[in-house]
From Swiss-Prot:
Name of the protein: LPS-assembly protein LptD
Oligomeric form and interacting partners: Component of the lipopolysaccharide transport and assembly complex. Interacts with LptE and LptA.
Record NCBIfam families: PRK03761.1 (NF002997)
Function per UniProt: Together with LptE, is involved in the assembly of lipopolysaccharide (LPS) at the surface of the outer membrane.
Species of the source: Pasteurella multocida (strain Pm70)
Location(s), subcellular: Cell outer membrane
Annotated transmembrane regions: none
Pfam families recorded: LptD, LptD_N
Signal peptide (residue range): 1-24
Positions in coiled-coil regions: none
GO biological-process terms attached to the record: Gram-negative-bacterium-type cell outer membrane assembly; lipopolysaccharide transport
Organism classification: Bacteria, Pseudomonadati, Pseudomonadota, Gammaproteobacteria, Pasteurellales
Gene: lptD
Keywords: Cell outer membrane, Membrane, Signal
HAMAP family assigned: LPS_assembly_LptD
GO cellular component: cell outer membrane; transporter complex
Length: 782
C-alpha cells in the first residue's frame, strides 16, 4: 500500500510538471494576471477632449458647482473615474476659469496606463492633475503594482509618498520596495526612490537613501543585480554591476568584484555607436593578486579589450580587434567574456580598407599574444598592405582575371629571429565553362615572391640569405557535375550525385632558406605559414600551408563526390561526401622527409550531415589513414532539439597520436597518446518555471572528466534564481605532464522580473555558453 502511495504521488508530481497549463508561455501567464486596456485608445491631448458625467442623481447650483450621487462616472478620453459621490466646482482665476472635481467615500480610476483604488481624490479638470489619498495602484498591460499614502498624478510623472512598489502579481509578495518618496517617470520609464527599503516576503534586506529602477524597456542607469558564489580558485566572490546610460548611443557597465583569495578586481565595459562606426572597450584590473602562487609578485594583473567596426565615406572600412592581458596565465585564472585559455592566443589586429567595384586596397597590422610559455613567439606583421584587382570577361572574352598582391614587414621580439620584408604578386586567369550537366574551371596562376631578410640581433642568431626570389607557376583544372534522380528509396524524394575531380600542378622549390629553422608550435614555418588541417573540403584547396612562406609542390588528382537527398518540398535532408588525393609525385617544401607527403594517396576524408526530422540532426566527419591502415581523425554530433532551447546533444571527437604529431611543427611537444573525448550536453525547460542545463565532457584516454557543469534555474513572474556548479580542468605553473588539477565553483545569480515588457525569458542560452567548452551548433542543415 505504501509503495502504491509513492507511485500515485510521483504520477501526480509528473502530471503537474508536464500539464498543459504549466507548459503555457510564462509571459502570457504573467500578463494574464494584470489589467488590460480594452477600450478604443484615443490619441491626442486629452485635456482638449470633452468631459462626460453620468450619475443617478445630480444637483446643480447654476454655473458655480454641481453634486453627483449614485454610480457616478466621469470620463474624458481614455480616463475614467467611478465613485458614489463627486462634487464639481469652478472658480474664476487670473488665468481663466478653473474647474475642480472632488471625490470622497472611495473611488476607482483607470486609463490606458494605470488603475487606482483610493479613499479620496481631487482632480483639476483643466489640467487633469490629480491628487489621491490612501490608494492601491496597478499598471495597465504590464506588471507593476503597489500602494501609497498619497499619489499626485501629473502628465509626465506620478509622485507618491510612503509608497510600495513590486512587479509581483496580486497575492504574491515575494519582493517589494518601500520608499519615503517615489517618483515614476512615465515617458522615460523609470522610477526614483528616496529612503528605500528592499524587502523579501516582508523582511527588510537592505536600505539605500536613493534608488532607481526601470519600469519599462528603456535603458536606465543604476545598480544591476549581483552575482556571487565560491570556487577553489577565487574563494568566495561577489560582483556588483553598475550600469550607466550615458547617452542614447553611449553606455557603460562597471563591475567591482571581490574574491576572498585574490582581492578586489575592477571590471568595466564601454559601448558606443556613432555615424562612423560602433565598438566596445573593456578592461579588467587586479592591483595585486593575493593568491599564494602570485603573492610575492609585485605586479598587477589586467586585461584590455577593444573592438571597433565602421564604414565611412561610402567606400572605406575600418576594423580593430585588440585583446591584451598582463600574463600568459590570465585566462586560466580568471573567467572573462573577452577570451578563454582554450583559444591559445589573443588577437591584436587593425585594418583599414578602401573598396571599389574592381579593386580594393587595405593597410593592416597584426600580432598575437601567446598564452603558453614559449621562448620564441610568432611574428607580427607591421605594416601589411594588400591590393586586389578583379576583372571578369577580360577584353570581352570568357576569361576572368584576378590579382592578389601584398607587401608586409615581419618582426619578432626574440633577438634570435630574423626580420624580413616580403613582396608578393599573385596574378591568375581562369576560364569557367558550365552548362546544365556541370562545370569546368581551368585556372593558371603565378606566385612571385621576393624576400629581403635581416639577421637577428643576437650574436648567436643564425645567418640568413639576405635576398630570395621565388617564382612558382600553377595550373588547376576543376570538373564538377550534378546528376539527379527521383528513383530513391523514399517516395517523392530526390537524390543527387555530384562527382568532383581536380588536377593541380605546381613545381617544387626548396624553401628552407625562407625564415628561421627554429620552428615551434606557434611560430610554424617561415614567418606566417603552418600546416592546415585536412578535411573533405580541404582536399580541394590549392595549398597545404597557410600564409605564403611555404607553397608546397603539387602534381596530384583529387577525386571526390557528394550525394544529397531532398524532400518533397525541396529541402535538403541528407548529404554525404567522400574524397581522396592521389599524388603523382610527393608534395614537398624542402628536402626533409618530415615535411613531405607519404605514399601515393592521402587519407580518405568523409563528411556528412543528416536532418533526420525537425527534431533530430546528425553531423560527422572522418579520416582514414591508408598508409597506417587506421583511423586518424573523426568527430560526430547527434542532437535532439524539439523546441527552442530544449537540447540534448551527444558529441565525440578523436585524433590519433600520429595525426597530431604530423600536424604539429618539429619543435612542438609530442602527444603521448590519442585524443578521445566524449561530450553530453542537456538543456531543458522542464516547465515554464524550471530549467536545467547539464554538461559532461570525458577524456576516454585519460579516463578523467574534462569539464562538468550543472545549472538550475527557477523563474517566476517577478523574480528568478540561477545556480550553477562547475568542475573543470585547470592548470598551474610548473605542473608535470601527469598532473591534473580541477577548479570547482558554484555561482548564484538572482534577477528581478516583470520590470520590462519582455524580460520573462530564461537564461538557458547563457548557461549553455558558460565554461571552457560551450555548446556549439555544428549543423549545416536546419
Amino acid at each position: 500500500m505504501k509503495k502504491n502511495s509513492y507511485t500515485r504521488l510521483s504520477i501526480a508530481i509528473l502530471s503537474t510538471l508536464y500539464s498543459v497549463s504549466s507548459l503555457a508561455d510564462l509571459k502570457s501567464q504573467c500578463l494574464a494576471g494584470v489589467p488590460h486596456f480594452t477600450g478604443e485608445l484615443i490619441t491626442g491631448n486629452p485635456n482638449d477632449l470633452p468631459v462626460y458625467i453620468e450619475a443617478d442623481q445630480a444637483r446643480l447650483n447654476q454655473s458655480v458647482s454641481a453634486s453627483y450621487e449614485g454610480n457616478v462616472e466621469i470620463q474624458q478620453g481614455n480616463r475614467q473615474l467611478r465613485a458614489q459621490r463627486a462634487d464639481i466646482s469652478q472658480q474664476k482665476q487670473p488665468n481663466g476659469l478653473q474647474r475642480l472635481a472632488h471625490v470622497r467615500g472611495g473611488f476607482e480610476y483607470q486609463d490606458h496606463q494605470i488603475q487606482l483604488k483610493g479613499e479620496e481624490a481631487q482632480v483639476q479638470l483643466n489640467t487633469k492633475n490629480t491628487d489621491i489619498k490612501n490608494a492601491d495602484y496597478q499598471l495597465v498591460d504590464r506588471q507593476g503594482r503597489g500602494k501609497a499614502e498619497s499619489i499626485a498624478l501629473r502628465e509626465d510623472y506620478r509622485l507618491m509618498t510612503n509608497a510600495v512598489f513590486t512587479s509581483c502579481l496580486p497575492q504574491d509578495n515575494a519582493w517589494s520596495i518601500e520608499a519615503k518618496e517615489m517618483r515614476q517617470h512615465i515617458q522615460e520609464e523609470y522610477a526614483e526612490m528616496w529612503h528605500a527599503r528592499f524587502k523579501v516576503h516582508g523582511v527588510p534586506i537592505f536600505y539605500t537613501p536613493y534608488l532607481q529602477l526601470p519600469i519599462g524597456d528603456r535603458r536606465r542607469s543604476g545598480l544591476l543585480l549581483p552575482n556571487f558564489g565560491t570556487s577553489n580558485r577565487d574563494g568566495y566572490f561577489y560582483e556588483q554591476p553598475f550600469y550607466w546610460n550615458i547617452a542614447p548611443n553611449l553606455d557603460a557597465t562597471m563591475t567591482p568584484k571581490y574574491m576572498s583569495k585574490r582581492g578586489w578586481q575592477l571590471n568595466g565595459e564601454f559601448r558606443y555607436l556613432s555615424p562612423i562606426g560602433e565598438g566596445k572597450i573593456a578592461g579588467e584590473y587586479l592591483k595585486q593578486d593575493r593568491l599564494t602562487d602570485y603573492r610575492n609578485r609585485d605586479r598587477s594583473r589586467h586585461l584590455f579589450y577593444w573592438t571597433h567596426h565602421s564604414s565611412f565615406l561610402q567606400n572605406w572600412r575600418l576594423n580593430l580587434d585588440y585583446t591584451r592581458v598582463s600574463d600568459q596565465r590570465y585566462f586560466s585564472d580568471f573567467d572573462s567574456a573577452y577570451g578563454s585559455s582554450t583559444d591559445g592566443y589573443a588577437d591584436q589586429k587593425f585594418r583599414v580598407a578602401y573598396y571599389q567595384p574592381h579593386y580594393n586596397i587595405a593597410i593592416s597590422a597584426k600580432q598575437f599574444q601567446i598564452f603558453n610559455e614559449v621562448d620564441i613567439g610568432p611574428y607580427r606583421a607591421l605594416p601589411q598592405v594588400d591590393f586586389n584587382y578583379y576583372q571578369n570577361a577580360l577584353f570581352d572574352s570568357p576569361l576572368n582575371f584576378k590579382l592578389f598582391s601584398q607587401v608586409v614587414h615581419f618582426d619578432n621580439k626574440s633577438p634570435l629571429m630574423p626580420k624580413a620584408w616580403r613582396f608578393h604578386a599573385e596574378p591568375s586567369i581562369n576560364l569557367p565553362l558550365s552548362n546544365r550537366y556541370g562545370s569546368l574551371n581551368i585556372e593558371t596562376k603565378l606566385y612571385a615572391t621576393h624576400y629581403q631578410q635581416t639577421q637577428g640581433r643576437a650574436a648567436e642568431a643564425e645567418q640568413v640569405e639576405r635576398k630570395i626570389n621565388r617564382v612558382l607557376p600553377q595550373v588547376k583544372v576543376d570538373l564538377q557535375t550534378v546528376l539527379a534522380s527521383q528513383q530513391t528509396f523514399i517516395e517523392g524524394y530526390t537524390q543527387t550525385l555530384e562527382p568532383h575531380v581536380q588536377y593541380l600542378y605546381r613545381p617544387y622549390k626548396d624553401q628552407s632558406n625562407i625564415g628561421s629553422k627554429l620552428n615551434n608550435a606557434y611560430l610554424g614555418f617561415g614567418y606566417d605559414s603552418s600546416l592546415l588541417q585536412q578535411d573533405y573540403f580541404g582536399l580541394f584547396r590549392d595549398r597545404r600551408y597557410s600564409g605564403l612562406d611555404r607553397i608546397a609542390s603539387a602534381n596530384q588528382f583529387t577525386v571526390g563526390g557528394t550525394t544529397r537527398i531532398y524532400d518533397k518540398k525541396g529541402n535538403e535532408r541528407f548529404n554525404f561526401s567522400a574524397g581522396q588525393i592521389y599524388y603523382l609525385q610527393d608534395s614537398r617544401i624542402d628536402n626533409s622527409k618530415e615535411n613531405s607527403t607519404y605514399g601515393r594517396s592521402s587519407s580518405w576524408s568523409l563528411a556528412s550531415n543528416w536532418k533526420i526530422n525537425d527534431q533530430w540532426r546528425w553531423q560527422g566527419s572522418y579520416q582514414y589513414d591508408t598508409r597506417l591502415n587506421k583511423s586518424s581523425l573523426g568527430n560526430f554530433t547527434l542532437e535532439y532539439n524539439p523546441t527552442g532551447n530544449n537540447i540534448i546533444q551527444l558529441s565525440y571527437r578523436y585524433a590519433s597520436q600520429q595525426y597530431i604529431d604530423q600536424n604539429l611543427t618539429s619543435a612542438a611537444n609530442r602527444y603521448g597518446q590519442d585524443i578521445k573525448q566524449l561530450g553530453l550536453t542537456v538543456a531543458w525547460a522542464l516547465t515554464d518555471q524550471w530549467a536545467v542545463v547539464a554538461r559532461h565532457y570525458q577524456d576516454l584516454a585519460l579516463r578523467k572528466p574534462v569539464e562538468q557543469y550543472l545549472g538550475l534555474e527557477y523563474s517566476t513572474c517577478c523574480w528568478a534564481i540561477n545556480v550553477g556548479a562547475r568542475r573543470s580542468v585547470t592548470s598551474k605553473e610548473n605542473q608535470t605532464a601527469n598532473q591534473i588539477f580541477y577548479d570547482k565553483s558554484i555561482g548564484i545569480n538572482i534577477e528581478l522580473r516583470g520590470l520590462g515588457r519582455d524580460d520573462h525569458k530564461g537564461n538557458i542560452e547563457k548557461m549553455l555558453q558558460r565554461g571552457k567548452l560551450p555548446y556549439l551548433q555544428a549543423f549545416s542543415l536546419y
